[in-house]
Structure formats: C-alpha cells, structure tokens
Regions:
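Active-site and substrate-binding clefts of carbohydrate-active enzymes
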Residues: 2-55, 76-77, 191-510, 534-536, ...
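Extended, Lys/Arg-enriched charged tracts that mediate electrostatic binding to polyanionic substrates
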Residues: 48, 64-65, 74, 82-86, ...
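Short, charged, surface-exposed secondary-structure boundary motifs
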Residues: 123, 181-190, 227, 305
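Acidic, His- and aromatic-enriched active-site or binding-groove loops in soluble protein domains
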Residues: 91-104, 108-109, 133, 145, ...
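CE4/NodB-like, metal-dependent polysaccharide N-deacetylase domain
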Residues: 128-152, 245-259
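Short, well-structured secondary-structure segments
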Residues: 4-9, 14-126, 130-131, 148-152, ...
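Extended alpha-helical scaffold segments
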Residues: 651-806
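Beta-rich nucleic-acid/ligand-interaction surfaces
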Residues: 154-161, 180-184, 301-304
Length: 806
C-alpha cells in the first residue's frame, strides 16, 4: 500500500480596510505593530516562508519554505494586502506554488478560496457565482494557472454551492467528516450511513450533483486536526509526524491519504513558533520514508475516487448546529460574554439580506441602461479590482467607448456598491460574540458604504430601514444597547466624502509639505493654489485643490482655509469651489485679519464663507491624526523628559543607596527613572553606530535600581536594529569590525531581554554561512590570522542566533 500525507492550511484574515480609504488603519491592540494584519504576518506568514528545522542541539540546521510542502489556500483579500504591504512574503507564497509543481507531478500546492469568505449556503445563487468567479480569477491573476480546487469558507456547504464549483471546472473541495451523510462504493446500490461509524478519511469521494455534474470531496481527519488546532500536537514535530502516520488504516486499498485541514494561522500565530513543528513534521516523514508528501490535486490524479458520497447540506466545520452561527442564537460563541447571547445575529442577517435585495434593484435598474447583462458585468469587475489603472480599458471593453465623465462615475459607483454588498457578508461579522465587536462593525461599514453609493447614484434612502432592522439586534453591553446604536455611534461617523478627504488634505498640509499632486489613500489631491502665512506659533493656510477618487474617478474641486492656533487646536473650512474673484477676496481678507492677530475674525470669515463646513483634528483619518497629535505633543514630551531626567539625575545616588538597603523605590522616583532609562536604551539601540559602552552602562543602572524594562518595545527596536546590522554584514561578510560590534551588542542585549524576533537575521546569517564559512575555514586552516578571528566571531554569533555551523 502506498502511503501519502497532506497537510492543508487555510490562511485567512478578516478584511480590515476602512471601506472609504481602502487601507487598514492603525489598531492599538496590535502594538507594537501597526495593525493585526502586520502582526500576524510577522508571527505566521513570514515564519512559514522561512521556517527553521532544528537539530539535536536545538540549533538551526536548515531553513525551509513550508508553503512548498503543504497544501494551502490564501484569502484573496489577504493576498491583496500582502502584495502591497509585505511584498517579500507575498512573493514567497507565489514562488512556493511554482516550486511545489516540480515536486507534485505538475500540481501546485495552492488552491483557490471563495472571494471574501462568505457563508456560501446563505448566499443567493448570483452571489455564489460571483464569489467563485472572483476567487478563480484572483487565483489565476496571482499564481498564473487555473486552480484545481477551492476552499469553502468555514467549509460551509450545500448542493448549490457544489454545483457552482463544478460549473466553473473546479475539481474538489475539502470538508469535515461530519459533513458526510452516507457513502458507498462506486457501482454498488447500498448506501452506508456515516452515523455510528467513522468515515474513512484516507480516500477521496465522488459527489454526484442534481445537475448531473460531479465533484470530488476530501474529508479531513478530524481528531488529528483538532489536536493540531488546540496546539497539543505542535509541541514536537516528530510527534506530529507520527500522529499523521497513525491516521493510516489497515485496509486493502492500493493507497491511502492521511490528511488534515486547519487554520493556517495555527502555525505561528495561534501557537507561536509552531511553524517549526510543521517544518520538522515534513522533514521527519521524508527523512524516515514514512510516507510521501503530496497535495490534493496530485493525489486525485493518481487515485480517482472509488467511492461516492452524499453530503449533509447546510453544515460547516465550526458550528455544531450547521450554519446557524451566522444567522441565529445557536449557542456557539467565543466566550467573551459568558452570560450573554447572540440574538443579534438574526436581525443582522435580516438587515444585510434586505439591503442586498434593495441594492440589487438599484443596480439592475440603472446598469441595464448601459449593458444587457448587469450581473455578468459584476462578475468581470474583479479584473478592474485587481488593476485599478486599467479603468478606461475595462469600461471601453465591457460597457462602451463613448461614455461621458458622469456616466463613467455612475457605472463605477454601481459596481463599487455591488462590491461592498458582497464584502458586507464576510463571515466574521457573525462569528464572534457581539454586534459591537470589530468584525461586526467592519461588515456594517461595508453596508454603510454601499448605502451611501446607492444614494449618490439613485437618490434612494436605504439607511433608515436598515437601521430600523438593526434596532432589533440587542448587544451584550449596556451601551450601545442595540445594532442601531452601534451603527449611529461607531459606523456612521466614519462615513467619508470628497469634502472630508479635502479637509484631511488641507489640515495635514499644515504639518507636511505636499507636492502639487499627492495620493491620499485611494484618492488624489491636485493643488492649484496654496498660500501659507506663519505668525509665531500660529499658521494660516488657504488654497484651492481638486480631490479625485481613484476608485470611481469622481472629482471635487474645493477651496479651503485652515488655521492652527499653535497647540492641539486647529480648524479648517472646506467647500466646493467658489468664484475666482470671491476666493481671491476671501484670501486677502483672511490674510489681513490673521496678520493683525484677529483670529476671531479669521474664524468668522471661514465660517461664513464656507457655509459652516468646518473640520478639526477629529476629522483627520486615524494614522495621520495620530502622527499630527504626536507632533503637536512633541513640546510636551520634551518638557516631561526634561522634568523626569532632572528627577532621575538629581536623585540617582539616593535611589542607589535605597536599593542597596533593599528599600523599594517610591513611585515618584521609580517612574521617572524607568521612563528615562527605557528611552535612553531605545535611543542607544537605534543610533546608527551602537555605543556598546553606553548600552552596558544603562543596563547596569537598570539592574542596580531594579527598574522595570519595557521589554516589548525593546524587543521591537532590537529586532529592527539586528536586521539592519545583519544586512550590512550580508554586503560585507568579511568585515571583522562589524562582527565584533554584533558580538558586543548581542552579549549585552540578550542579558536583559529574550524572545527577540531573529527570523530575518537568522535567514541572512544562515545564507552567509553557506556562502562564506568553508572559504574562511580553509583560510584559517592555512594559517591566515584574520580568517581565524573571523571564525571565532562567526561561531559566537551562531550561538547567539541559534544557528548550527556545518
């Protein structure tokens, strides 16, 4: 019997982009990273692209790309983010699929995923079709080939979903064993119920569909997958490998496939560093010839299904009640509110379904004026989503060449309205414990954007009825009390138009010198007039610009005036462009009042002239708001630092005496001391030339005073510094002075903090060793003193970095 092993990772993160900006904004809970995508990329996606295999002494003996060995799917919305924000990791994923084809008889490791992770059985046929087509096209665009299989979000399945997969030439999908209803050998009449007997997961099954089509199904081994998901199996790669091989059964089949499927984030994010267990699992199986590593496409070609199966419709892998987790108070929850309930799920689903149907009516009514089949146009819209620069070609090829500016904007708004009507069904919105959670807020933001676009193209008010349905969705919190209050307090204030983008541009121009043309998230600003007047700490700027949406092409010419009072108070007025002479007169009046120091008159003129369209620091988008706020507080920071440094330096001796007498430091002394020492440590580490003497002095002071170090921040800045130094070493691997600096730096650093992210530096060091070590050893063996010194230092660095030298 031939034995095969396949481990599938479902890699996905909920889309977190602000629907009006198309960017993920800063998420404080992900500190020290910018956002959760960034954090999980560092902990998981990056780790699996260069995973370590450890030898008996727990040192790195090899670095491998796990994606070349495992079967995997990546969410299209996640890949879009990775392509832009982590291009090296993105490239590793794409390259892994190419490499895997050489190992798996031409079959790639990657399979597709339904576009934005909706619960397919709860979608109408039209949305199912678009989800599958967008998932396929996104896959082809990125991986350069057609997908053989597709991952169904939450493995939620019904026959109609399988029909859509089969219609689009997809050969297989992966399900949990409890989603099988009954099976039989092909050609037999008798069915065997899965109830009461475990389904044999080591073989593929053929599922006959009502239309006459068929699709192959793989049912993963659930007990092993569960042990992997909860982390127990990932503490040791050898145990993991043996457990995978325990899946094989004693039967007369010519081959068996031991396979599991789990969230890809299990390997590194849910359980830190467990990517190494996965890497060692593959290594152990292959090294000991326990089985052959494969992917589903290869196995299916070699061993077509000899059994057929019927599924349990409306089931999933993550809800004991089928698919009720995404539409009712079924009892499945995450545990955040132990005495709470999820009665909000039903009204939220109802609100989205009602909105979808209303949006469909608007879309069909207007888009039918331009094309015969509006829904076929929506299916093709993915091509423009993936290449926003091709908008003119897309419109001329799909709609027509003689469109006016207004028609182009209207068509693009309709298509965007439909894109957001799909995004608002992202499954995470219902998965967790409350409608006030960030996942539910995210999908309601998509709904809000779709509502806004519908109003702009048709004048229809869908918001009132939508909020009325949400009002029936109770939260598990006292405030906000229901979905309507969540929407009004947490979603509606984020709604953005071109005027607000103009305000963001105008206000931020006080702190950043912009070129005449600048991108502002998914918009662009073209400045035609800009005047700035400084009077001490106060600033007045007036200007004229055109704000343009790079998504729907809409343009909005604006005039603006912004005033900074010198502290955290700044105000701006923005409105549609006024007559040239009126604007010129206003600028002169504002400038005259400002130079006289009459800010009251400046504000009166702004308010009257711009129709009360006033904006402040609160209207800036989050990242820029935070940056400007910190800039405004720079003087305050300096004053605090000066004060704390005075306390620290003038009381250092008494603090040292108190600690020598085992007297705890009072907060009034320890807080300033910790602030100053942590700041000085970070600054010393970040300096271009690390002064190891100063670093050692600061560490000694922290120890003598028993001060608390900010280890999380120190880890972050240290990792960046080590990566920088290692990049320099990569360019000059024989630089002994640099090796000595690294040795000194490591000896001090690792005496105060642990668990520094060394992955990038280990990768570089490992490659330097492979390229340079033997040459240096030969030189040292021939008596070259510099080479001997190089070997001594390189071996010390290898110990610090945990890399074995071959």
């Amino acid at each position: 019997m031939e034995k095969y092993v396949c481990i599938h990772g479902h890699f996905y993160q909920p889309p977190r982009e602000n629907p009006w900006l198309e960017e993920v904004e800063m998420e404080d809970s992900a500190y020290p990273y910018h956002d959760w995508n960034d954090k999980i990329t560092q902990e998981c996606y990056k780790q699996n692209a260069a995973s370590r295999i450890l030898g008996p002494n727990k040192k790195i003996i090899d670095i491998v790309n796990n994606y070349t060995k495992m079967s995997f799917d990546f969410g299209p919305t996640l890949l879009s983010w990775l392509e832009k924000h982590a291009p090296d990791i993105y490239a590793s994923v794409i390259e892994a699929d190419k490499i895997s084809r050489e190992s798996f008889s031409g079959h790639g490791a990657a399979i597709a995923q339904a576009y934005n992770h909706i619960i397919m059985p709860l979608a109408n046929r039209r949305d199912k079709q678009t989800q599958v087509l967008w998932g396929i096209y996104d896959f082809e665009h990125r991986f350069g080939r057609k997908p053989e299989g597709m991952w169904l979000p939450e493995t939620a399945v019904d026959l109609e979903t399988l029909e859509v997969l089969a219609e689009n030439q997809l050969k297989f999908t992966i399900l949990a064993p409890h989603q099988a209803n009954r099976y039989r050998q092909v050609g037999e009449k008798e069915w065997k119920n899965v109830d009461g007997s475990e389904l044999d997961t080591t073989r593929p099954y053929l599922c006959a569909l009502p239309s006459g089509q068929t699709i192959s199904l793989f049912f993963y081994h659930s007990p092993t997958a569960t042990e992997v998901a909860n982390g127990r199996l990932l503490q040791n790669g050898e145990s993991f490998a043996k457990k995978m091989c325990d899946i094989f059964t004693e039967n007369n089949c010519p081959s068996q496939l031991a396979h599991i499927a789990t969230d890809g984030e299990t390997f590194g994010h849910h359980h830190r560093y467990t990517d190494m267990a996965l890497a060692y699992c593959f290594h152990y199986i292959e090294f000991n010839n326990l089985a052959r590593i494969t992917v589903y496409g290869e196995y299916l070609e070699k061993f077509p299904p000899a059994y057929e199966v019927e599924i349990r419709e409306n089931t999933s892998w993550s809800c004991n009640h089928g698919i009720e987790r995404w539409r009712s108070n079924c009892g499945c929850h995450y545990g955040k509110y132990p005495s709470g309930a999820q009665q909000w799920r039903g009204p939220l689903r109802e609100a989205m379904d009602w909105l979808r149907d209303e949006l469909s009516g608007v879309y069909e009514k207007i888009m039918s004026q331009y094309v015969d089949n509006p829904w076929a146009l929506r299916d093709r819209y993915i091509k423009l989503i993936l290449d926003r620069n091709s908008v003119e070609d897309f419109l001329s090829n799909t709609v027509g060449q003689n469109l006016s500016y207004e028609e182009k904007v209207r068509i693009l708004k309709l298509l965007e309205m439909q894109r957001h009507s799909l995004l608002m069904y992202t499954s995470c919105g219902w998965y967790f414990d409350d409608i006030s959670g960030i996942e539910a807020i995210q999908i309601m933001q998509y709904a809000c954007r779709a509502i806004q676009l519908a109003n702009e193209v048709d004048g229809i008010d869908l918001e009132s009825k939508f909020k009325g349905i949400l009002e029936r969705a109770p939260t598990n919190t006292r405030e906000p009390a229901n979905g309507r209050e969540v929407y009004d307090s947490l979603i509606r204030p984020n709604r953005t138009d071109l005027n607000r983008v103009g305000a963001h541009f105008a206000l931020s121009s006080l702190f950043t010198e912009y070129p005449d043309e600048i991108d502002v998230f998914c918009y662009s600003a073209t400045t035609e007039v800009y005047d700035r007047v400084d009077a001490g700490i106060q600033i007045l700027a007036t200007g004229r610009a055109t704000i343009r949406s790079n998504i729907v092409l809409e343009e909005h010419p604006i005039d603006f005036a912004v005033l900074h009072f010198g502290d955290h108070n700044l105000t701006g007025s923005v409105n549609a462009r006024m007559a040239d002479d009126a604007f010129a007169n206003l600028r002169e009046s504002l400038k005259r009042a400002f130079t006289k120091g009459d800010t009251t008159e400046v504000m009166r003129l702004m308010n009257v002239s711009f129709g009360g369209n006033n904006y402040s620091l609160w209207h800036l988008f989050k990242d820029e708001q935070r940056r400007i706020l910190y800039e405004l507080l720079e003087t305050v920071w300096r004053e605090i630092e000066t004060s704390f440094r005075h306390v620290y330096e003038h009381n250092y001796m008494i603090m040292e005496m108190m600690r020598s007498m085992n007297i705890p430091l009072p907060k009034a002394l320890s807080t300033p001391a910790e602030f100053i020492l942590n700041q000085d440590l970070c600054q010393t580490i970040q300096n271009e030339q690390v002064n190891t003497g100063e670093l050692r002095r600061l560490v000694d002071q922290a120890r003598r005073l028993s001060l608390q170090l900010d280890e999380e921040t120190l880890r972050f800045v240290s990792s960046k510094k080590i990566n920088h130094l290692m990049a320099k070493l990569e360019k000059s691997p024989d630089d002994i002075n640099l090796l000595e600096s690294l040795d000194s730096f490591f000896s001090i650093l690792f005496s105060i903090i642990s668990n520094v992210d060394l992955q990038t530096s280990q990768n570089v060091f490992f490659m330097i060793g492979k390229k340079t070590y033997m040459e240096m050893k030969q030189r040292a063996d021939s008596g070259k003193a510099p080479a001997k010194k190089w070997l001594e230092l390189f071996n010390k660095l290898a110990n610090y970095l945990g890399v074995a030298i071959h």
